[in-house]
Amino acid sequence: KRVSIFSPGEIVIQNVGNWLATADKLGEFVGKTYFLKKDGTKINAKISIRPTFADGKSNAQTGYCGVTEVIDEDITVPINLSTKIIKGVAITRVPFTSASIFPMLAIAAYYAGLGDGLFSVTSLLLAVFGVLLLHLSSNVFNDYFDVSDGTDEANNEYFQPGGAAITGGSRAIELGIITLNKTKTVAISLLLASLLVAGFLFYNIYQVTGATSNVEGALAVGLSGLFLGYFYTARPLRLVARRGLGELAIFLAFGPLLTLGTGYAISAETIGFLSNEFYMLLSLGVPFGFLTTNILYINQFPDAESDAKTGKNHLVVTLGKKAARWGYLVILSLAFYSSVYLNDLLNVHENFNSNVFLVGNAVLYLFGLSIFMKLLKNYQKRELVNANIQTIILQTLFCVFYIISLNLFFI
């Protein structure tokens, strides 16, 4: 049994690594802690941890041996602020919010490249904060529903290099960091906070534009994103289990809808429905949507067996791992094709350099192809984790490249 099953999650995060390091260095760690029964009552204990070896200390270490002695002393383990922050990051998966925040900054760069005074900085800050909260809420809701459906519990092949959750959800509930019910409470709280920020944002949009049309557009896009994020794993729709609808939801929510919504939120002018600017904002989101979808897509490979057992029939389960490899290449190629397509549309702007844009796209596409080659080779191996991480890096680099290339005022 893992110690995290019966030890408070905060104690595991804060202390277990140091306990094991001390055992490695000194040959034994001796200390006091407490464990929890299923009913929540404490078991105060003295613990001893020693490293174990294959056949004597001259051979490879095979693990650790722990001895627990129940004691009468009431043990308390102070939890540091840094541990509480790490706990919050683990539960909400904060690092993944770069997938939503960076495309928003790219739209701000687009407006800055067009000229001065074309977007509201206040609206941008409110929009980024609101989307951040909404994204975190969606992450936590997804964990809640995946655990409720038994998907995460059935998954023993997830990737967590260095403790960072890459696939298989946050594992926060499984590690005892938070309970299932508290997960739902956190998700709802984050959602309500995002709606509160949205209220301030809508007021500022009206103050900037003097009209309600952008407010209505931002509201419609925001509700659409909320719908897709919630029902990605929530029943009765559970889009992730509907053979491609989950991937489509991610593409829309982190692509065209995100960039269009950002435009509605920050533009100093009203955006007409189906106007040229409306289509431009949608088009700018297409490559972002594809690259973010590929993050989700490649993360489905290590989880495929457990997902199939629990009815989570996404594209990798539907196609089978071997055939699904080529889906990554298709999505990657569509991302960069749609990006290069934007070259002619953007080339009319003063602070845009077509050569820089095309060369940057070519370099990043080659990086993407190198990731695809790793997927081709390692799709059934633990070494695939490198491709998973690099897919996240690719999406981030692409966003940063867009932020720079859409406003090359210094060239």
Model-found features: residue ranges?
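Short loop/turn elements at sensory-signaling interfaces that couple input to output
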Residues: I47-C65
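Membrane-embedded alpha-helical segments that form the functional core of polytopic membrane enzymes
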Residues: G117-F141, E216-Y230, L274-I298
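Solvent-exposed interhelical
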Residues: F141-L192, G289-S333
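Intramembrane alpha-helical segments
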Residues: G162-G163, G168-I271
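Extended hydrophobic alpha-helices typical of membrane-associated regions
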Residues: L345-F410
